[in-house]
A protein has these predicted regions:
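Positively charged n-region of N-terminal signal peptides that target proteins for export
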Residues: 1-6
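Extracellular ligand-binding/catalytic regions of CAZymes and related secreted enzymes
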Residues: 26-29, 197-329, 406
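An acidic, glycine-rich "communication" segment
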Residues: 106-202
Length: 434
């Protein structure tokens, strides 16, 4: 009787755990995973059975966000196709960005589609990713729970589209499939030149693609992990399947972090380029002048063009870059208020200068400072006086960072502020649950 009683209690506890709240920071075998999609439901469910504690699937079109409540990780499978053709009108199957807190792996083009809907990083790149991982960083995602065998990396000729930036005749890549010569649906890779400035973003690896060697294939923003490779588990080799499992395990630990920056996508409408774009494009010999001319205002272009040859123009564009700002048409132009201030909006001295000017007895100087603060620090106290702005700056100084990816503004890092850790020090795995 006692044995039967103990067995009954054990069974009850097992059922309670299976039906209860998500297991934060759990091992892979303890995780409850929900696949949201339609196209590859059987493949993912069959693969994950036996790997995780529980796996279920929901149709993407019928999915309700509250259905994810009892799961540790959601896999969103949302390919490009007829459903996503009108990207300006896309609606997220996960609901509103502000309401979604579940750790999520974005499979293939789900990273693009959700980025367009939610204005995330990931909305600029190309559907051109091959199943060849490149530039693997020294990161735990390649070690736990399964060690990725870097000894299986191979050398291939440097892709044509990488040669402008890489001088080496060969690069080393990790194949995620065995038959790498077979043509497949390409995955989604994201332009990643500015990733290092964002506290909530970490880059794990790139992949062979038809744009740049710096593009990201596997990376994280907040509680969202982008697994850009399009291949299903049944198409992958052992390293590919292990990498997918490691991605699920890693993102399960990020229930507190969230994407911070609001980054509009070029696929949803006009977006201002970053300030470095004109100079960078001028130094790219194959880009036509007209393409570069189109991203800046006529007045700004006249100043750049007057510098002389292409390299001289690039140098002048570099000089102007710190004062560039998008106008209402999302074209870059010189901000006269920044020129008068004498520093870029993302310069650490920006707040010291503007706050000093806000106390000026000259109405023109104080008015300019107020405009700059409202324009570049929209989370601040708006039209408040210098004392209120100074208190806000002092309260948030350790947690501030700036972005010019279409947004051109300062942000407060909410996780860093909540934990009382400077944003510059709270990066990568340090943002996982404690």
């Amino acid at each position: 009787m006692r044995t039967a009683g103990r067995l009954a209690v054990a069974c009850w506890l097992a059922l309670a755990c299976a039906a209860g709240a998500p297991a934060r920071g759990a091992d892979l075998s303890e995780l409850k995973v929900l696949y949201v999609g339609s196209e590859r439901k059987s493949d993912y469910v069959e693969f994950l059975e036996g790997q995780v504690a529980r796996v279920e699937a929901r149709s993407r079109k019928a999915f309700r966000p509250e259905e994810a409540r009892d799961f540790d990780v959601v896999l969103l499978d949302w390919p490009q196709g007829e459903e996503t053709r009108e990207m300006r009108t896309l609606r997220s199957p996960l609901g509103a960005r502000a309401d979604w807190g579940r750790p999520t792996v974005l499979l293939g083009s789900a990273g693009l589609n959700l980025a367009v809907c939610w204005k995330l990083k990931g909305g600029s790149g190309c559907t051109c990713l091959d199943p060849l991982a490149y530039d693997l960083r020294d990161h735990e995602i390649f070690e736990r729970p399964h060690r990725i065998d870097r000894g299986r990396m191979i050398a291939i000729p440097t892709p044509k589209d990488f040669r402008d930036e890489l001088e080496e005749p060969e690069i080393r890549v990790l194949p995620l499939v065995d038959d790498r010569e077979t043509r497949r649906m390409p995955g989604w890779c994201t332009h990643a030149l500015d990733f290092a400035r964002y506290p909530d973003v970490e880059f794990f690896c790139g992949g062979v693609n038809s744009q740049t060697p710096t593009s990201a294939a596997l990376w994280r923003q907040g509680n969202l992990l982008h697994f850009g490779f399009q291949e299903s588990p049944s198409e992958m080799n052992e390293n590919g399947r292990r990498l997918l499992l490691n991605a699920i395990a890693y993102i399960s630990r990020f229930t507190e972090d969230r994407p911070i920056a609001v980054t509009p996508s070029v696929f949803a409408g006009p977006v201002a380029r970053s300030r470095s774009t004109p100079a960078r494009w001028l130094r790219h010999g194959e880009l036509r002048i007209d393409s570069i001319k189109d991203v800046v205002s006529p007045e700004t272009w006249a100043e750049i063009e007057g510098a002389g040859d292409r390299e001289a123009m690039a140098r002048r564009a570099d000089e102007l870059a710190r004062f560039l700002h998008p106008n209402a048409e999302q074209i870059l132009e010189v901000d006269p208020d920044l020129v008068a201030l004498g520093v870029a909006f993302d310069d650490p001295a920006f707040f010291d200068r503007t706050l000093a000017d806000l106390r000026s007895s000259d109405p023109a100087v104080a008015g300019r400072a107020g405009r700059l603060l409202r324009r570049y620090a929209p989370e601040g106290p708006g039209g408040a006086d210098a004392d209120a702005w100074t208190r806000w700056r002092d309260e948030n100084r350790p947690y501030l960072f700036a972005s010019d990816a279409g947004d051109y503004r300062w942000y407060v890092d909410p996780l860093a502020k909540r934990r009382g850790v400077p944003s510059a020090e709270l990066r990568g795995p340090g943002r996982a649950d404690r």
